[in-house]
Amino acid sequence: MGQTVTTPLSLTLDHWKDVERTAHNQSVDVKKRRWVTFCSVEWPTFNVGWPQDGTFNRDIITQVKIKVFSPGPHGHPDQVPYIVTWEALAFDPPPWVKPFVHPKPPLPPSAPSLLPEPPLSTSPRSSLYPALTPSLGAKPKPQVLPDSGGPLIDLLTEDPPPYRDPGPPPSDRDRDDGEAAPAGEAPDPSPMASRLRGRRELPVADSTTSQAFPLRSGGNGQLQYWPFSSSDLYNWKNNNPSFSEDPGKLTALIESVLLTHQPTWDDCQQLLGTLLTGEEKQRVLLEARKAVRGEDGRPTQLPNEINDAFPLERPDWDYNTQRGRNHLVLYRQLLLAGLQNAGRSPTNLAKVKGITQGPNESPSAFLERLKEAYRRYTPYDPEDPGQETNVSMSFIWQSAPDIGRKLERLEDLKSKTLGDLVREAEKIFNKRETPEEREERIKRETEEKEERRRAEDEQKEKERDRRRHREMSKLLATVVSGQKQDRQGGERRRPQLDKDQCAYCKEKGHWAKDCPKKPRGPRGPRPQTSLLALDDQGGRGQEPPPEPRITLKVGGQPVTFLVDTGAQHSVLTQNPGPLSDKSAWVQGATGGKRYRWTTDRKVHLATGKVTHSFLHVPDCPYPLLGRDLLTKLNAQIHFEGSGAQVVGPRGQPLQVLTLNIEDEYRLHETSKEPDVSLGSTWLSDFPQAWAETGGMGLAVRQAPLIIPLKATSTPVSIKQYPMSQEARLGIKPHIQRLLDQGILVPCQSPWNTPLLPVKKPGTNDYRPVQDLREVNKRVEDIHPTVPNPYNLLSGLPPSHQWYTVLDLKDAFFCLRLHPTSQPLFAFEWRDPEMGISGQLTWTRLPQGFKNSPTLFDEALHRDLAGFRIQHPDLILLQYVDDLLLAATSELDCQQGTRALLQTLGDLGYRASAKKAQICQKQVKYLGYLLKEGQRWLTEARKETVMGQPIPKTPRQLREFLGTAGFCRLWIPGFAEMAAPLYPLTKTGTLFNWGPDQQKAFQEIKQALLTAPALGLPDLTKPFELFVDEKQGYAKGVLTQKLGPWRRPVAYLSKKLDPVAAGWPPCLRMVAAIAVLTKDAGKLTMGQPLVILAPHAVEALVKQPPDRWLSNARMTHYQALLLDTDRVQFGPVVALNPATLLPLPEEGLQHDCLDILAEAHGTRSDLMDQPLPDADHTWYTDGSSFLQEGQRKAGAAVTTETEVIWARALPAGTSAQRAELIALTQALKMAEGKKLNVYTDSRYAFATAHIHGEIYRRRGLLTSEGKEIKNKDEILALLKALFLPKRLSIIHCPGHQKGNSAEARGNRMADQAAREVATRETPETSTLLIENSTPYTHEHFHYTVTDTKDLTKLGATYDSAKKYWVYQGKPVMPDQFTFELLDFLHQLTHLSFSKTKALLERSPSPYYMLNRDRTLKNITETCKACAQVNASKSAVKQGTRVRGHRPGTHWEIDFTEVKPGLYGYKYLLVFVDTFSGWIEAFPTKKETAKVVTKKLLEEIFPRFGMPQVLGTDNGPAFVSKVSQTVADLLGIDWKLHCAYRPQSSGQVERMNRTIKETLTKLTLATGSRDWVLLLPLALYRARNTPGPHGLTPYEILYGAPPPLVNFPDPDMTRVTNSPSLQAHLQALYLVQHEVWRPLAAAYQEQLDRPVVPHPYRVGDTVWVRRHQTKNLEPRWKGPYTVLLTTPTALKVDGISAWVHAAHVKAATTSPARTAWKVQRSQNPLKIRLSREPS
């Protein structure tokens, strides 16, 4: 037996468990495959001597580790865990590694022990000192490090042994080498020594003293080793933070240990291993090795120098020599440098900025925290004088607001040092008022403010009453004087005054009381008017009586009316809205004037129901309640001592409600039970709990909230949107109220978001809404913990039927915001009246912030936790700010409500008294109506759904389904009912609303009207789930027992996925139960569930058939349904389809396992064993392989010795498709016979026996809802299975080497398939499906009309072959011709001429009867073409510069495609002007970057670098980026004429062609996915003949387009495919025979250009107006032509050039010209002038 060679790599693989354990100890994870790859492939390439079989050499491992840990792009971070694990195996080897680890070389013997010389003096900047020499009289200690071969150490001895074996005393030469510096001369300090933190110089200890350091002098004068005690290491590790948390503190600790303990190399490793993690230690060692400096004082990269100064393995330093001690000192210095460099975290000034002074934090303590932040998060030293300015600014800006503001106002701030700022801050801090003083001051200011406001209100009220009394007195005096004048008759009246005219001086602009001409002397006692002097006993005497007033609600706003029985009509003073054309004259004290009535009828409710309109009189001093409205209200006015009271006929105060006329019908509805109003005792007993009495709330137990931002977020500033004056005035009172309450405060912030005024429906009131979408994007997301309303009521037992519902008012405003987070929510506001012009921000949690609901919900849960503990018998449900309290009795509900209100008041929350529902048996909560342990849909919810109109767009349909989906628990079978609606919501689907959709729409609405009541889930009782399945839809009802009845809890329904929908009924029931059980779990909360269904599915779940279910689905169903602690199966029941509840009679029993066993493929007698009496035994095979870079495929049907059928398949055909085609062909050829067919394809065998039927049942869809591959071939195979009389499909192994019949037949079929794929060239056809039956002569059926037409043509009938022959070809009947041409047109939508040209280029093997007539009829009647094609326009054809060969001259343009899809909105179109070849790329933007990207990545690699590019003057083409790229590449970029699309005619025409084709394809396919249809449009454009009869495909590739090649019935006659050389020769001929004539034709057009326009200089033309107005001529002018170009004209009177297409000739009528002769001063000259006719 041979021996196996063991290598380090194989050794680790044999002990892989130990390797993984070692990796886990290093906090890393390794994989075996990558372990082998790195060891054998990666690390040998590092050129450090790593063998492919691995090694445990520590030096080589260290070199590899350095390579792996290299910073920047040369490092290998993915290999770090593997080299760290390998290093751990080498440095701490397990038993199976130790034999492979290289032993350490023995330490050289040291010199004899003598007193060491005094150590060299260190640099003043150094903080590390050599070991101290002890005195000679030191007591010897027992040994610590024994000899490797000696006995065990006696730890109880007194003195330790020396650290190294004693050696001979150093000679002079040794002293010169190791201690070269003289005794009195200190060596140069190392570069690292000057950089260490320690800068204090300690005196050199006396050689006679001894200290308890790890290296200390022994009794023999040598340095002895004292190890660290375990207690010291334990204390250091546990009393200090980790290196990752606070590297500075741990670095200072290690520095002090290095200074005081003088540790050796081994001690340093022990210290690092204890205080640092493995990863931190590796990072420190790597940084220390980087700090090693060479002889020139710069960091070196030489490995030998780095290993000498900072070795990774134990060095052989002799600490009794000066050389060894110097090495140790340098090692400690480098170690400290590594600690400092590794501890430097990346600069994060945001962390520094986040340090702010606390409310009660002293300035000195804050400064220390600020400096510590600078040390931790920046590389700057805060003690550095150069950083003092930055620290000072941070100290000022991040101090408390009051301290920061005062520090900013200090004089000569620049000259202040940090110490001066701290002293000033301390003074300000010490002068702060105490909390008690602050509360007292705020209370005093509040009282003073309230007192001032109260006094002002009283003064205003007194002034208002005085003014009203004075006006009423004037009115009554006027009435009295008028009556007196009427009685006197002959007395002259005073002249009538205007409303702004003075009654004293008759001047306008002031009244008599303000008249400057009126004497102001002391007034005498006024005589009392007899009419007003009332001699009443015990009355008011001469005091004015109180005016009768009543406050009514008009239009939702309270209006206080003055009851005036003398007024005929009621009056409003403010504008109530639009006014009608109806008006009336009103006679007042100052004269008469016409006023208008209100437009809208108003409906008032008092004791009765009345309709009324008001008179709008703005000049009236007070709104008046006249006799018209008082009469309708049956009002009664009582005069009492306290004043007049206006009541109804029953003595109750009048309550008036105003609403629009369109809501008048609601007044005639039947009255409902009156709601129990909130009693006054609840308001008075708990004033702090209500928003109406307690004011704005404040959660006293919640700390201010800090809103964390994302790491990369920056402030966003969005300007305020324009706001109308009406909206600004509407939200102004709200802003003022929030400012007075302190919820809004002025601020200055870099953040700003706009304010949106939202008008409340039905009123003129606005409310401010802030657009915080940009702020939400920049704030960290938190997990939402708001309860799900779907199952929130599951925690409400039906036994609790007394409810209290509270809605917290302004809930979010109860939580405070931290001052650091307040600037995030700033917005702009200007109010000149209040003196505000700047920003305001929120001091409370704002609305519109994405995390507000979660933050408030959690805060309220914490505050109400105590209430829940104290009242365990009550049920308290909380959904954000909506509270539901439930109890079993009215008394418990009242007591619990009182306790809850008291708790809310104490906590600082406020409830809305208007929305409160106190101790009722029927309440509304979260859109549900709760009553007697059941939940109902509210009428408002039903009306919302019923009021929605028929959807017109997918968005409206989604809104309807979302609203109705909220109510799906009340609708049995909602998923099945809404099935016709969901396909219309998909993107890219045509919205075609048909009868099915209308029926589903109405059924959902009808189901809502009959929605039943659902019981609340009782978690103390088990649940029953009745499940049924129908046509792929799962339906069920979740019930609970209520006495002898079953009460529904929820109706569940869901559509099964495409895979489950294709199963047999029994398995579909299993899927339905699984789906509904999962949904029911949201309501049952894990309580026991009994499943009842018409199928016995428990046995199916326990033993599911592997034919139908995958392992993953089987495991899922079993884990969900076989949980016996939660799910149980009941007996089989028959369900009522309407109610889904069990019927009283039993249903038909069946065995699901037996039915599934009988469920076979489409043919029940299909066998997989050979038939003994078969007529044929055939072998099929399909082959697909790569040859010369092209995938070739073929299929064959053979016997053991001969080929029955063989065909080459199109290039790219897969092997699975070829196998299906071969098997299908064999079945077709064996029609009506007994057949044994062998196939070596498991795919074809399984499809025929098992999977084909499964695919058919589920609609040939995958689990993702997409079509399966080879759909058409599978359908053809399933259809062909029924053709043979008897059939057996047998699977045989492929590529057998035996001599059996199966092996020979299989080899024959495989060889035939490969040969036919190599020998024959399949004809490409996109018009006919590969597996469809081609037209043959036997399928031709001629009609009488066909026979007549053929007789006229002179065709002959072949009676033997049974078809007509004309021109030597079989004649295709008219119907066949129509079907073929119609199918061709549906694919291409080419015109009549283009399609005819294609058919004539490559004649068909058949003669198509009436081809031209049929084709013309098809193209003319095509609906898609008629909707898209533009009408013809007679435009003269011009000439265009083209390239001389393909790929040299391109035209480029962007065209927009609507609607956008997947973000793509544009098409970038490239057209080769020579060949007409088109390239089009969907793009998301229309930029120069997109143009250059496609040009360099698509055009250049495939067609070469263009020479000329032609574009319009779009921004993407004239930009500097595009032009610069063109200049660098040497491309001549030609910009076409502006506003002239014809100059880019070729690409513009192609844009139209693409859009038309895409439109036709979307109409034909019903899909809106134009990105998916774009390749078909490009295929059509590339294969359409051009002006010269050649297609772009032919010009470019030299081959006929694949569109015109129809399949020949006899495929065996196809010639062999040409070789590569023949193809190249054909291309060469194309270049000479096609490209050169085309180039010559293009050049000939250029040589003979067409005259672009007939206009010449001097002609008169009209110029078109581009924008015409109403009744304005379309043409302007005429103008005279001054200059011309081939495309434009310069005319007199217009500065710009005018395109020739925008002008037309002006015809002038001949006019008779008259000339006049005049003399001049020169007798030899005369003047001729033309007179106008």
From Swiss-Prot:
Residues 1442-1600 form the Integrase catalytic domain. Mg(2+) 2 binds at D1181, E1219, D1240, D1310. Mg(2+) 3 binds at D1453, D1512. The RT polymerase active site binds 2 magnesium ions. Binds 1 magnesium ion for ribonuclease H (RNase H) activity. The active site is at D564. Residues 428-433 are annotated as: Interaction with host UBE2I. Residues 112-196, 202-221, 432-496, 511-550 are annotated as: Disordered. A motif (PPXY motif) lies at residues 160-163. Residues 436-476 form a coiled coil. The modification Phosphoserine is found at S190. This is Gag-Pol polyprotein. It comes from Cas-Br-E murine leukemia virus.
